[in-house]
């Protein structure tokens, strides 16, 4: 029988000092011997996805104590990628993921906590906490803040749905008036919650459902809806149950590594491909798998991307549907149900509810269950009222969307495409692979050949695009923006958005060793590995070189002879694989990150061989 970790600081005369301090936090005599459960919150007023989380920690804590645990809350940092976008702040986004993972480890191990409830929401917070949970391997439940409602506004006598990306694109479009641009800006982000499309934050929160580490509805139920409160309450109750099963019954099946197995990672990646999720999820799943000591690699992603169809298209891949529509269609359990019926899911993996994912689908998939309460839950919809308050409305759709032929979520037979929403490409310019969100690529440019136009930084690329240097037919190459070369692997949402603003969204490709926002669509290929700073061939591309892209055949090639490439490599060896004439201030903290960072194909985690 495993001993409570917290007994280290609560039992024995030699821990009198620690107990005295515990008492000063409010613990009573009968609390010693109960599991101490860390409530890992991420409230901040900087981030709309976290601005409503201030009281969520104590909501969960009260439920933990109601069912027999001792709850202790602490906070992590949280970076808003949208606000950090387009300037030096973006260098800090990806490194913050690892900092969050470390900070959770520090707090939990320093205080000998027995279990965790992780209250996350936005881009790097969920992955950072996920890495920590798999590293620590103590009972853990994830519950996120929930998605934002989609923005809505009236243009040309039509009501259209909006999100953050629309504000970015229209703001840079010279053909859009100031009044219309401001109208879109004011309407794009109406409520608290993670941005309303299938961007990185929502993608990751959905993947925690597929991994089995969060409750059904976690990825899709709106932040503003009263139903979301039940997820927080259920998380508090469930973590106490997991503690009892592990510490009192020696049931190791409740531990994160027992739940998030290789098969569960396959399920999560299959979900990501099926829903056309953010390419950032690839980075984060690779990183989380390493923490779980699971052998999940780019080869697995390639394998799955060749067989899993695209079953759901959500913004930014279409403006018709946002997360509120995914929830109405049955949420993640509905997509997993369609994958299961197509024979594309490992249905025996376990979940925090103590059942298999197959059993969970049978209970929560609206196509399988007649449970009125579950159908009511998935009818939870938007109110269309600007607010920063959680649980502030209880509006419902009249019906669920169970149309699997023409609805938001499709069956395999009626898939948006039989080819999945994400693909891994490889070739001489990306020997270790690169990633493209095929769900966001127009069919007319699935095969593309063009002349390279090379930029040594995102900032230069933005200037080149807005200044008219980039023309139709170009392959925009942005290099030295990888984990090591940035350092920090910036998102390239502004370059991709500005290509659309300039009318080049379907006329150009973009290739980078950096990464993309979950809001990116178009022929945008990221995570090129090895990155330029690690000696990757993207570092030797010159203006005018032909780059051929073939998504159906998963190939990308730099059309330069081996003799010429050898000469260019030798030249870069002498120069140290550094960007030419780039002026960028890099802090000591970022230099440390860059020194240890691996390329994207390894999840941009720290290179353990350097320690």
Swiss-Prot record:
It is an enzyme of class 4 (lyase). Mg(2+) binds at residues 81, 123-124, 491. InterPro entries: Dihydro-acid_dehy_C (IPR042096), DihydroxyA_deHydtase (IPR004404), DiOHA_6PGluconate_deHydtase_CS (IPR020558), ILV_EDD_C (IPR056740), ILV_EDD_N (IPR000581), IlvD/EDD_N (IPR037237). The modification N6-carboxylysine is found at residue 124. The active site is at 517 (proton acceptor). Its EC number is 4.2.1.9. Pathway: Amino-acid biosynthesis; L-isoleucine biosynthesis; L-isoleucine from 2-oxobutanoate: step 3/4; Amino-acid biosynthesis; L-valine biosynthesis; L-valine from pyruvate: step 3/4. GO terms for biological process: isoleucine biosynthetic process; L-valine biosynthetic process. The keyword Mitochondrion does not apply. It catalyses: (2R)-2,3-dihydroxy-3-methylbutanoate = 3-methyl-2-oxobutanoate + H2O; (2R,3R)-2,3-dihydroxy-3-methylpentanoate = (S)-3-methyl-2-oxopentanoate + H2O. It comes from Histophilus somni (strain 2336) (Haemophilus somnus). Belongs to the IlvD/Edd family. The keyword Amino-acid biosynthesis applies. Homodimer. Coiled coil: none annotated. One of its GO terms (cellular component) is cytosol. Its cofactor is [2Fe-2S] cluster; Mg(2+). This is Dihydroxy-acid dehydratase. Keywords: 2Fe-2S, Amino-acid biosynthesis, Branched-chain amino acid biosynthesis, Iron, Iron-sulfur, Lyase, Magnesium, Metal-binding.
């Amino acid at each position: 029988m495993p001993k409570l970790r917290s007994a280290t600081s609560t039992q024995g005369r030699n821990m009198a000092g620690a107990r005295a301090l515990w008492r000063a936090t409010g613990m009573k005599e009968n609390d010693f011997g109960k599991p101490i459960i860390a409530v890992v919150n991420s409230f901040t007023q900087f981030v709309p996805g976290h601005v409503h989380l201030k009281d969520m920690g104590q909501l969960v804590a009260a439920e933990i104590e109601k069912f027999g645990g001792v709850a202790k809350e602490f906070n992590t940092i949280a970076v808003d990628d949208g606000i950090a976008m387009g300037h030096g702040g973006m260098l800090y986004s990806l490194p913050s993921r690892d900092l969050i993972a470390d900070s959770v480890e520090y707090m939990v191990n320093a205080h000998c906590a027995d279990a965790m409830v992780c209250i996350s929401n936005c881009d790097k917070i969920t992955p950072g906490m996920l890495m920590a949970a798999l590293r620590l391997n103590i009972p853990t439940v994830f519950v996120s803040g929930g998605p934002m409602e989609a923005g809505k506004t009236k243009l040309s006598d039509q009501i259209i749905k909006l999100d953050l990306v629309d504000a970015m694109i229209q703001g840079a479009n010279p053909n859009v008036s100031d009044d219309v641009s401001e109208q879109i800006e004011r309407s794009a982000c109406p409520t608290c919650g993670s941005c309303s499309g299938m961007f990185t934050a929502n993608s990751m929160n959905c993947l925690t459902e597929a991994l089995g580490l969060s409750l059904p509805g976690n990825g899709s139920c709106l932040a503003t809806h009263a139903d979301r409160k039940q997820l927080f309450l259920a998380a508090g109750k469930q973590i106490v149950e997991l503690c009892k099963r592990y510490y009192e019954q020696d049931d190791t099946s409740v531990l994160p590594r027992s739940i998030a197995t290789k098969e569960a990672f396959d399920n999560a990646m299959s979900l990501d491909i099926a829903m056309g999720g953010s390419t950032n999820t690839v980075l984060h799943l690779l990183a989380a798998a390493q923490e779980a000591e699971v052998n999940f690699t780019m080869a697995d992603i390639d394998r799955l991307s060749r067989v899993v169809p695209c079953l759901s298209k959500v913004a930014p891949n279409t403006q018709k549907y946002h997360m509120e529509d995914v929830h109405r269609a049955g949420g993640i359990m509905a997509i997993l149900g369609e994958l299961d019926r197509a024979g594309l899911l490992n249905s025996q993996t376990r979940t925090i509810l103590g059942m298999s994912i197959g059993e969970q689908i049978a209970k929560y998939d609206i196509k399988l269950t007649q449970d009125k309460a579950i159908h009511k839950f998935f009818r939870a919809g938007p109110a269309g009222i600007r607010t920063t308050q959680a649980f502030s409305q209880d509006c419902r759709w009249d019906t669920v969307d169970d149309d699997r032929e023409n609805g938001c979520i499709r069956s395999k037979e009626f898939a948006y495409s039989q080819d999945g929403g994400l693909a891994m490409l490889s070739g001489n310019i990306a020997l270790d692979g690169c990633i493209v969100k095929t769900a966001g690529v127009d069919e007319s440019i699935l095969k593309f050949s063009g002349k390279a136009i090379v930029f040594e930084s995102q900032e230069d690329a933005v200037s080149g695009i807005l200044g008219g240097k980039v023309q139709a037919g170009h392959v925009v190459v942005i290099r030295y923006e990888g984990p090591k070369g940035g350092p920090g692997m910036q998102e390239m949402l502004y370059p991709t958005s500005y290509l659309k603003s300039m009318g080049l969204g379907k006329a150009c490709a973009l290739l980078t060793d950096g990464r993309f926002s979950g809001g990116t669509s178009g022929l945008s290929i990221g995570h090129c590995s090895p990155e330029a700073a690690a000696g990757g061939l993207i570092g030797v591309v010159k203006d005018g070189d032909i780059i051929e892209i073939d998504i159906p055949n998963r190939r990308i090639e730099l059309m330069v002879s081996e003799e010429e490439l050898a000469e260019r490599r030798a030249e870069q060896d002498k120069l140290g694989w550094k960007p030419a004439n780039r002026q960028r201030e890099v802090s000591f903290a970022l230099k440390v990150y860059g020194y240890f960072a691996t390329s994207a194909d390894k999840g941009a985690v720290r290179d353990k061989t350097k320690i």
